[in-house]
Amino acid sequence: MKKLAPAFVFSALTLAVGVAAAQSQPVIGLITKTESNPFFVKMKEGATAEATKLGAKLLSAAGKTDGDNAGQVTAMENMIAAGAKTILITPSDAKAIIPAIKRAQQQGVQVIALDSPTDPATAVDGLFATDNYRAGVLIGQYAKVAMAGKKPVIATLDLFPGHPVGAQRHNGFLKGFGLTAPDAKSNHLGGAAAGVVCMADSFGDAAKGQTGMENCLQKNPGINLVYTINEPAAAGAFKALKAAGKEKDVVIVSVDGGCAGIKDVGAGVIAATSQQYPLKMAAMGVAAGVEYAKTGKKVSGYTDTGVTLIAGKAVAGVESKDVKTGMDLCWGNK
């Protein structure tokens, strides 16, 4: 790993630095939000495998933290200088990254968003991602049935304000649960829903998820349902609940479907999670980059890469797969 600037981490896989490298084989860049989140680790694995398969050179970079827009901008500039003709990016800041994307496109670079849309979504050439609103709806529907007969006292551990993915999952969960919620196009969290007693930002991080859950329990010790933006946040929430002696009284639902998260479903930490497929997103992005390098044909619009509800215990009226299936599928692992 080689650090080129303090704001981000930049690495090269089979990289010959310089524009000349692009003349012999396609050069494709992958910029993720962080390199510590298992989701983005798996995405990088998928991009690496597809690049090797198709004979492309892959550059990779990641912000230090989720929300590190400056690091992503610098990474993009370095990749263009190194000859990348397609850049795949999971935008940390859906709006702030737009000027850098426009500059790249003006230089003939195809820019494809993975997992997270930009704002507006049309700023990139294409988007390969989960339908995050549907992912939220699925776990909301599951939670509604799982909580039958109980008065819901809900906490949400979200990403951070204004991010499309965070809003779509949160609002989808509310919709699936039967509560008032903004539609899939809104980047604002629905917060006035009956039963939601606490909302906290976790940044998708286990430690911050634990802190957020602790704070929510202080506000309302009677919380019995927790939505989390992802499985690391869910794991943090469970730690807080266990420390308070409440882990058996609370249903946790989440999104991601990574192998570690599916194990947590099997262990009863998470009741159900919506599984997405970063390996598929990355592979499709690399393939599109190779196609552009060879033919000049760009991708366009949104491609749904799929979502599956994985549950520890099936509930009536909500289609789901079991833990074994989730482990077989986790993030496209097999």
Model regions and ranges:
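A residue-level marker of the well-folded mature domains of exported/periplasmic proteins
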Residues: K3, A21-K334
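Gram-negative bacterial Sec-dependent N-terminal signal peptides
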Residues: M1-A22
